[in-house]
Amino acid sequence: MAEDKTKPSELDQGKYDADDNVKIICLGDSAVGKSKLMERFLMDGFQPQQLSTYALTLYKHTATVDGKTILVDFWDTAGQERFQSMHASYYHKAHACIMVFDIQRKVTYRNLSTWYTELREFRPEIPCIVVANKIDDINVTQKSFNFAKKFSLPLYFVSAADGTNVVKLFNDAIRLAVSYKQNSQDFMDEIFQELENFSLEQEEEDVPDQEQSSSIETPSEEVASPHS
């Protein structure tokens, strides 16, 4: 018997069961451990989806924040970062960013400025966490990293190898993303919402008069567009 192609997967079904959803992106140079951090956090429960068309890996996760079920999409660069720039669609409607550098490779720390500049070009207001990965020597946590201080960004010392601070990092990132989405003042969000509203208005204008008159006779509830 042929498989029913229309049946939603468990991951897709999560969209309907969740109270809300957020998108969290990861930035940083190649081989700083972004994917390893996500896999360490999600462990056996993760189901990565390779989206080669967009040169990214998508990880889906369900979290509970303040009693609500949140569907989280973690976006990983999947090698696209080797070009030192990401496609604009990568940033589209992101609610938080995790920016990673390898504490043992100074060049990855210096490149944070480039990644941060690009992030703010597309997402001026979303919360961003700076992550120092691969802390084999605990003494490195005593070092001062001016980049995070300069931009008033939280700095986490983590290890994908042994799991140090990984769970806290991602749980905090999820909470920041949810809080941002609920209280967003991002100008780009307003622009996207205006464009979506404009498209809806255009569609209504294109409806034939007969259909419009029949729709007027049928009462319907006004549904507010969710804030993204």
Swiss-Prot record:
Source organism of the structure: Homo sapiens (Human)
Region (Disordered): 200-228
Matches recorded under NCBIfam families: small_GTP (TIGR00231)
Keyword field: GTP-binding, Nucleotide-binding
Family: Belongs to the small GTPase superfamily. Rab family.
Descriptive protein name: Rab-like protein 2A
PANTHER family xref list: PTHR47978
Pfam families in alphabetical order: Ras
Function summary: Plays an essential role in male fertility, sperm intra-flagellar transport, and tail assembly. Binds, in a GTP-regulated manner, to a specific set of effector proteins including key proteins involved in cilia development and function and delivers them into the growing sperm tail.
GO cellular component, one term: endomembrane system
Subunit structure: Interacts with IFT27, IFT81, IFT172, ATP6V1E1, HK1, LDHC, MAPRE1 and HSPA2.
